From Swiss-Prot:
Keywords: Oxidoreductase, Pyridoxal phosphate
Gene name for this UniProt entry: gcvP
Cofactor or coenzyme needed: pyridoxal 5'-phosphate
Catalytic activity: N(6)-[(R)-lipoyl]-L-lysyl-[glycine-cleavage complex H protein] + glycine + H(+) = N(6)-[(R)-S(8)-aminomethyldihydrolipoyl]-L-lysyl-[glycine-cleavage complex H protein] + CO2
Name this polypeptide is given: Glycine dehydrogenase (decarboxylating)
GO terms classed as biological process: glycine decarboxylation via glycine cleavage system
Biological role: The glycine cleavage system catalyzes the degradation of glycine. The P protein binds the alpha-amino group of glycine through its pyridoxal phosphate cofactor; CO(2) is released and the remaining methylamine moiety is then transferred to the lipoamide cofactor of the H protein.
Record-linked CDD domains: GDC-P
Complexes and interactors: The glycine cleavage system is composed of four proteins: P, T, L and H.
Length: 952
């Protein structure tokens, strides 16, 4: 009985009960799940043994175990800085966004009608960044500051007219930023010059990257260096501190072309490295070369203001190897939190925090000088670097003994950084550590600071009404609730997005993320203080080894696209070590996710596309011909398994063997790993390296477009090339590639989510989850096959964990498109499946294992009902242009207006199924005009008058 209690979570996570599974299996003609799997997955790759994960644990037991692990982390007061700072997450934001499934379980807002809430908050984020940087346009977040700086280099390289391949990076940049830039520059053949911006900019460059303020805290006027960068035909990039910009002149005023940085200190815990939302802002003229997603303002079909993702043709899912970046998952949830922080505090609140930090830092520095210390710079915002000379080691050790972490710059200098969480007590404690006799009695007059007068900010910021309206908790609470209710997330209904694995993000998995033991540590804390995190990392690595069959694991990549880049770089390093630098051709099937070709291009590989056959498999003959044609230069094959067409390819082992015979390596995109866990191990059937989407298979929520985690796993011969880190030396092998993420272990705090999931499921539950994911997908394919053709099936007639329904014949016969069906689904309260990918004119459905039989039946009956409406169009009962599909979605404003000119009844529009009468989602806007939005690009918050127009 007690042992069975430990399995309770398996039944909680998996939607269909055992009885419901049997009903579904019977309808498909199978006796049990094992028979279904044997008939669906190629026999030669089927796992013969159980995973080495252990028994399942109850929620309570797993939480107790993880709590014990977390307590092994020593929480010291951190003065380390380097881009990571203590901050307070206002509780109204913590509870109503960060801990709220209405926000964290939503998907990237590609369907704008069901995403107006998060789109509005992301637009607030963009407006906030534009205000602080003074730039014309900002994106809706990147992965971290190091990545953002590397993307700035990439933008500069794309638009450069110079023949130069040199990039200047100030030695005063954060070391982790320099590390990531070097990693990204190397495969592109770019030369990084690290030096002094006052002396070392002497020749043509692509761009110059300067930290503002510098990593040691010094504030220097970068105007002259920016002029020099422009003189030598480069773009000027300032890596900024967002809170400092409340006090400092904006990058735009100083002449910068691009501003990047992190919004972490706006309410996002350090989390031992993440997740945090980076920002990227630039001039209007470079908007079409920007990386990442951009939220813009458009109109719906009624002419009302509506938000949408703008300029999507820049992105990897459309432009593939010509994309501006391989970025897919970003940090939407964290951008939303930081924007909410600015909304809640407003300009006066932010100014107060900035001035408090600045004053405390100045007072501390003054007392140091009075005690005889010499400072590295007397002009600073929040960071003071002290020349401690032969006292360095003694002071550093004294700090550790007092439970305080400070930064050891070198053998003769220490640095301390203040933040929102620091107070007089902490400052005076630090003064004692430095053996100063005097203490700070009270803060100085707020007009006093150590910022140069010529760099003091005079321009305003956060002037928009949204930043000046919600400063009481009541008002903020209602604003956040209004936005949440505008959207569809998993707490409303199933989100059957193919290739996205929108499974349950259980509350028990989420709880540890905000524990102080996981949320408060600085990523560069001494490793001996972080035994809890190290144990969590070790467990997770061992489990991922068991699940994948690979030998080496790196947890550093903080998104799937980063994992792709890291995995391909590992392959590149392998060929380099073997003296085969000529190997630069990457074969990629035409069905691949857009990040694949974009990532291959980023590591300097030439993309050669391989055809797919009529059954959705890689065309083996075409692959064979291209492998032979490029044999001498073949670097890799990128393959997704099961395929993006939703089938288990029978020839996967032959495909891998073919590539190996031609000297190449096989990279497996792990986007569909949810169909393999406990069933087959990639390391056993041919691939050499793969990335793992923890935000898909292992339950990290999508957060409306991030965070994610994309660790990579590889075979023994590739382990020595896994990423290392310049700050934390024992992260990764000494022979490894440079850092791909700013933090050593990526977004460490959310790894606890995957730890909890795996611990609670155990070997048995993980296998069952994959089996039921495949069962649910095949049940849906079976239920829908008479209404919509299933485009691809495997050898036995089954699909994998997702299926593609073909809309192309419907479109040619009735004019109804996959978009019309997607928008009509909104009237039924459903987010659309994946549209027109990987095949145009189709929809890809992935139910995951977490959806119950009743929800799946409801979803299927909804699609069948929509097919009946299409039949009415074909028969002439419905008009071809004025029908419930072409006009979907229908808003409550439209349905309750005095005017109704449509050739169908209001009731047909509003309540097409009976279940909607008791649980109806009302979209806040009608169908959004995408063309208008891109032709009339507007990426800042609309005026209040325009908000009022929308509400009218």
């Amino acid at each position: 009985m007690l042992k069975n209690a430990q399995k309770d979570f398996i039944q909680r996570h998996i939607g269909p009960s055992v009885d419901e599974q049997n009903v579904m299996l019977k309808e498909l003609g199978y006796q049990n799940l094992d028979d279904l799997i044997k008939d669906t997955v190629p026999e030669k790759i089927l796992l013969k043994d159980d995973l080495d994960i252990g028994d399942p644990n109850s929620e309570y037991k797993a939480l107790r175990k993880l709590k014990d692990i977390s307590k092994k982390n020593k929480i010291y007061s951190s003065f380390i800085g380097m881009g990571y700072y203590g901050t307070y997450t206002p509780y109204v934001i913590l509870r109503n966004i960060l801990e709220n499934p209405g926000w964290y379980t939503s998907y990237t807002p590609y369907q704008p009608e069901v995403a107006q809430g998060r789109l509005e908050m992301l637009l607030n984020f963009q407006q906030m960044i534009i205000d602080f940087t003074g730039m014309d346009i900002a994106n809706a977040s990147l992965l971290d500051e190091g990545t953002a700086a590397a993307e700035a280099m990439g933008l500069s390289y794309r638009i450069s007219k110079s023949e130069s391949k040199k990039v200047f990076v100030s030695k005063n940049c954060h070391p982790q930023t320099i590390d990531v830039i070097k990693t990204r520059a190397e495969p592109l053949g770019l030369e990084i010059i690290v030096g002094d911006e006052d002396k070392d900019i002497k020749e043509d460059i692509i761009c110059g990257i300067i930290q503002y303020p510098g990593t040691l805290g010094d504030i220097k006027d970068p105007s002259e260096a920016i002029s020099k960068i422009h003189k030598f035909n480069g773009k000027a990039v300032l890596a900024c501190d967002l809170l400092a910009l409340a006090k400092l002149k904006t990058p735009a005023e100083l002449g910068a072309d691009i501003a990047v940085g992190s919004s972490q200190r706006f309410g996002i815990p350090m989390g031992y490295g993440g997740p945090h939302a980076a920002f990227f802002a630039t001039k209007d003229e470079y908007k079409r070369s920007m990386p990442g997603r951009i939220v813009g303002v458009s109109v719906d079909r009624h002419g009302k203001k509506a938000y949408r993702l703008a300029l999507q043709t820049r992105e990897q899912h459309i432009r593939r190897d010509k994309a501006t970046s391989n970025i897919c998952t970003a940090q939407a949830l964290l951008a939303i939190v930081s924007a909410a922080y600015a909304v809640y505090h407003g300009p006066q609140g932010i100014k107060k925090i900035a001035e408090s930090v600045s004053q405390l830092t100045k007072n501390f520095a003054d007392k140091l000088k009075q005690s005889g210390y010499e400072l590295y710079s007397n002009e600073f915002f929040d960071t003071v670097t002290i020349k401690t000379l032969d006292k360095t080691e003694k002071i550093y050790k004294n700090a550790l003994d007092q439970g305080v972490n400070i930064r050891k710059v070198n053998s003769e200098m220490l640095a301390v950084s203040f933040d929102e969480r620091k107070n007089l007590y902490r400052a005076n404690q630090l003064l004692k550590i430095f053996n100063c006799s005097e203490t700070i009695k009270e803060t100085m007059n707020e007009s006093l600071s150590n910022i140069p007068k010529n760099l003091l900010r005079t321009s305003t910021y956060l002037d928009h009404p949204v930043f000046n309206s919600y400063h009481s908790e009541t008002e903020m609470l209602r604003y956040l609730k209004k936005l949440e209710d505008s959207d569809i997330a998993l707490n409303k209904s199933m989100i059957a997005l193919g290739s996205c694995t929108m499974k349950l993000n259980a509350v028990a998995e989420m709880i540890p993320v905000t524990w102080k033991e996981f949320s408060q540590p600085h990523p560069f804390s001494p490793v001996e203080q972080m035994d809890g995190y190290r144990e969590l990392f070790t467990d997770l690595k061992n489990w991922l080894r068991s699940i994948t069959g690979f030998s080496g694991v790196s947890l550093q990549p903080n998104a799937g696209a980063q994992g792709e880049f890291a995995g391909l770089m590992v392959i590149r390093k392998f060929h380099e070590k073997n003296g085969e630098t000529n190997r630069n051709v990457c074969l990629i099937p035409s069905s691949a996710h857009g990040t694949n070709p974009a990532s291959a291009q980023m590591v300097g590989m030439k993309v050669v596309v391989v055809k797919c056959d009529q059954y959705g498999n890689v065309d083996y003959e075409d692959l064979k011909n291209k492998a032979e044609e490029h044999s001498e230069n073949l670097a890799a094959l990128m393959v997704t398994y099961p395929s993006t067409h939703g089938v288990f390819e029978e020839k996967i082992t032959d495909i891998c063997e073919l590539i190996h015979n031609h000297g190449g390596q096989v990279y497996m995109d792990g986007a569909n790993l949810n169909a393999l866990v406990g069933i087959a191990k990639p390391g056993n059937f041919g691939p050499d390296v793969c990335h793992i989407n923890l935000h898909k298979t292992f339950c990290i929520p999508h957060g409306g477009g991030g965070p994610g985690m994309g660790p990579i796993a590889c075979k023994k011969h590739l382990e020595i090339f896994l990423p290392k880190h310049s700050v934390i030396k024992d992260c990764g092998p000494v022979t490894g590639m440079g850092a791909v993420s700013a933090a050593p272990w990526g977004s460490s705090s959310i790894l606890s989510i995957s730890w909890m999931y795996i611990k609670m499921m155990g070997s048995e539950g993980l296998r069952k989850a994959s089996q039921v994911a495949i069962l649910n997908a095949n049940y849906i394919a079976h239920k829908l096959k008479d209404s919509f053709p299933i485009l691809y099936k495997g050898k036995s007639g089954n699909v994998a964990h997702e299926c593609i329904i073909d809309i192309r014949t419907i479109k040619s016969e009735t004019g109804i498109t996959e978009e019309d069906i997607a928008k009509r689904l909104i009237d039924f309260g459903y987010h659309a499946p994946t549209m027109s990918w990987p095949v145009a004119g189709t929809m890809m459905i992935e139910p995951t294992e977490s959806e119950s039989l009743s929800e799946i039946d409801k979803f299927c009956s909804t699609l069948i009902k929509i097919k009946q409406e299409i039949d009415k169009i074909q028969s002439g009962e419905y008009d071809k242009t004025d029908n419930p599909l072409k006009n979907a979605p229908h808003t409550h404003v439209e349905l309750t207006s005095n005017k109704w000119d449509h050739k169908y009844e209001r009731e047909e529009a509003a309540y097409p199924s009976e279940f909607l009468r008791t649980n109806k989602y009302w979209p806040p806007v009608g169908r959004v005009d995408n063309v208008y939005g891109d032709k009339n690009l507007f990426c800042t918050c609309p005026s209040m008058e325009e908000y009022e127009d929308t509400a009218a």
